[in-house]
């Protein structure tokens, strides 16, 4: 490929599912590469496998790409001169090219049934041979083909893979990669219904759309020699290929959609209240790293820095802890009003806050969220973080460590004195609560952990949490007094 050729890259999803982490990373790296080089980022929908297409799959993919912060220069919703941008609308482009290969003797009709092909594969496996098509129909005469069709057989079209060739390409990530043509076998380029297969349609589309670089996952690397053979058959120049290493879980296994230990779909992160900028940041570091130790960057900084030479040759580890840390860095920078907006739907969904808030309730939610602003990693996390504010006194239970603290002889005296102090307060505000705790210290002679821990455990139900006077203010007089009453009655 010429060095001066305009950079044009594509993300080409199939609408057979929703946008997951792996595909989002592919889209993101192509987006960054295009923007870094002032090139074009194209969205092409590869929807030829109609049986597997999911309703709203295409719309959902594009909605979530936009939510992550990506825009594109051409696509189904951004017309350009290289359209149509859905493969299902490009059949009239593929058909004459398939016919051209047939006419030139570079492809042939195959009448083998699925049963015959399966039997062939099983026989090869039994002989410890690599399963590949034997070429059974490669030399059928026109008369034999006509006889098959007269019998009602519909042909698929297979590409004639040349024998004894080494197919080599320089990969942006893996450097020089080679495949032997003898290990490939004649592959199908058009199915029996005339619809082109993935490898044929992709090669044709990438050429006609003038795609300069194909940056995709490592799981596509075995497709590359087939696509290069198609390029060569037409006398076209292949794009530059780059195959990113796969994303693995903590067990170093490839991410699987069935792996429940990791949330994999962007829509789910969106629903949980993750921030798009944070997810963009996290995904951009999955298998790519800048110079230095810094890990938090803006989209503009990523665009400026992105260099495919810094793509890792080792699998990218999906680290849940790192993801929550990254999102927390972004949440901490948000104004409190934005964090409340992020949190409120989750509190309402949990049924702990009413759907139709009045101003007093909204003010209370602001106070509640402010206690966890620095700690929160995503919107939905406010629910488990703040559950102590909604528990009934009778439902509060204590673990063994908390029970040990509450078993000290001075605890009933401390709790009784603190209850008396709060009952005397006209306004339950943090400053007044703090002063009340000091008076309890003076009255009882108990100080330090012996004073604070019992008060915290009885009033909040937890040994650790937000600053105690603030937590008690947000809990409110009625709830705090009720919890102390309940504990004193039971002890």
Curated annotation (Swiss-Prot):
Q: What is its EC number?
A: 6.1.1.17
Its main localization is: cytoplasm
> How does the record describe its quaternary structure?
Monomer.
Q: Which PROSITE patterns match?
A: AA_TRNA_LIGASE_I
Keyword Metal-binding assigned to the entry: answer is yes
Q: Which UniProt keywords apply?
A: Aminoacyl-tRNA synthetase, ATP-binding, Cytoplasm, Ligase, Metal-binding, Nucleotide-binding, Protein biosynthesis, Zinc
Please give the cofactor(s) recorded in the UniProt entry for this protein. Zn(2+)
Write out the catalysed reaction: tRNA(Glu) + L-glutamate + ATP = L-glutamyl-tRNA(Glu) + AMP + diphosphate
Question: Which parts of the sequence form the motif 'KMSKS' region?
Answer: 254-258
- Tell me where the signal peptide lies: none
Name the positions where ATP binds.
257
Cofactor: binding comment: Binds 1 zinc ion per subunit.
Naturally occurring in which organism (per UniProt):
Listeria welshimeri serovar 6b (strain ATCC 35897 / DSM 20650 / CCUG 15529 / CIP 8149 / NCTC 11857 / SLCC 5334 / V8)
Q: What is this protein called?
A: Glutamate--tRNA ligase
Q: What does this protein do?
A: Catalyzes the attachment of glutamate to tRNA(Glu) in a two-step reaction: glutamate is first activated by ATP to form Glu-AMP and then transferred to the acceptor end of tRNA(Glu).
Annotated positions binding Zn(2+): 110, 112, 137, 139
Residue numbers covered by motif 'HIGH' region: 13-23
Q: Under the GO molecular function aspect, what terms does this record hold?
A: ATP binding; glutamate-tRNA ligase activity; tRNA binding; zinc ion binding
